[in-house]
């Protein structure tokens, strides 16, 4: 039996509203990275956590602490979500930190099938992430009305 955890990109989940629905669908259907498990092997999803965010000097340490929340419940493999695979320039650093801190846990990069190329995905995410938006400052300065 494989006991899995998924780490999602906090920018994708918190700022862009990703609900991990594609990751979970492919987990259930054994597609994408989950297709690497034998059909006869039972898969259990122990939990999903978000990355602590784009790093400062403590980024890898913060991620290691978050992963402890899964290791305490017997996770044996951590999957970095497709968002991390396609978007994160720090994924290899994070992967190394987890492998060093948890040598008995396998770290895999990827979850669901790729629906577009990673480059196209990055461009599309950048477009929605960088849209101008209104903030509380606009309300305070009375700039929140259209026109």
Task: Set out the residue ranges of the language-model regions.
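Active-site charged/polar residues at nucleotide-handling catalytic sites that mediate phosphoryl
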Residues: 73
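Short Gly/Thr/Asp-enriched flexible loops that form oxyanion-binding sites at enzyme active sites
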Residues: 88-102
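Structural motif
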Residues: 3, 76-77
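Conserved mixed alpha/beta catalytic, RNA-binding, or beta-rich assembly cores of soluble enzyme
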Residues: 1-70, 84, 90, 105, ...
